[in-house]
């Protein structure tokens, strides 16, 4: 685990901390399929990553998942649990998660084949959302360009 002050912007391995921005480091800590959680903050949304990465000391990486759960299924489930994590975080100045909070999660244990069906569907939807955000960004850039040139 790394301290955020040691992060680099031009390394080759993703470095996850509690920010939305992914930083990079020249060395990795884990080579896993994992669900990554910020250990403190005001919101607790997971990230999914499969490969080599580094991790801030105040982040959790959930990996080597039990065989009755697909990691992506667990990731999608965890995306629905922000309010649970906010309610169960501890601390008076900065809300923090503890390992016990994860252990108490009540995860629906459905057949692995059904999990895979859900994953396929949700992955398709997520891909479409990302693609649409890219298109929207291009439209916004085009609009700014037109507005800046129309009223010169």
Feature roles, as predicted:
Residues 1-109:
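DNA target-recognition domains and sequence-specific DNA-contacting regions of bacterial/archaeal
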Residues 106-152:
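Amphipathic alpha-helical coiled-coil/heptad-repeat segments
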